[in-house]
C-alpha cells in the first residue's frame, strides 16, 4: 500500500513531441523518443524477408504506428488513439501518404539520425 501512494505524486516522463503541418493545415504530431526494443523491431522490419517494396511500405507503417501521437485533419477533433491513427493512415490517399513519408524522413533525420529512413 505504501509504494502505490508514493507513485501517485510523481510526474510521469513524457517523450518530446514535434508537430508537422502540411500545406492544407493538417497537423501530425510525432514522438521524439524511441526505445531500444522499438529500434530493434524497426531494423527487423527493414531487413525482413519481404521484397523491397513490401519492406519499404511496412517500415513506413511501422514508424507511423510507433511515432504518431496525434493527427489533426481539416481542423476536426484530433485523432489520438493508436488504433484510430493507424486506421486513418491506412485510409490515407496517395498525397497524404507521400506527405507522411516525407514527414517521417524529416523527423528521423532530426531525432534519430542513426536510423535508416524508409
Segments from the language model and where they lie:
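Short Lys/Arg-rich cationic patches that frequently serve as NLS/NoLS or arginine-rich RNA/DNA-binding motifs
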Residues: 1-13, 40, 44
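Short acidic-hydrophobic surface loop/beta-edge motif
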Residues: 13-25
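Short, surface-exposed, charged amphipathic helix/loop patches that serve as local interaction elements
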Residues: 26, 31-118
Amino acid at each position: 500500500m505504501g509504494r502505490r501512494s508514493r507513485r501517485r505524486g510523481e510526474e510521469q516522463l513524457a517523450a518530446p513531441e514535434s508537430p508537422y503541418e502540411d500545406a492544407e493545415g493538417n497537423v501530425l504530431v510525432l514522438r521524439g523518443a524511441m526505445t531500444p526494443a522499438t529500434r530493434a523491431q524497426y531494423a527487423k522490419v527493414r531487413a525482413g524477408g519481404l521484397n523491397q517494396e513490401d519492406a519499404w511500405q511496412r517500415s513506413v507503417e511501422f514508424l507511423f504506428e510507433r511515432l504518431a501521437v496525434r493527427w489533426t485533419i481539416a481542423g476536426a477533433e484530433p485523432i489520438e488513439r493508436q488504433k484510430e491513427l493507424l486506421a486513418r493512415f491506412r485510409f490515407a490517399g496517395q498525397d497524404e501518404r507521400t506527405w507522411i513519408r516525407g514527414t517521417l524522413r524529416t523527423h528521423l533525420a532530426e531525432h534519430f539520425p542513426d536510423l535508416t529512413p524508409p
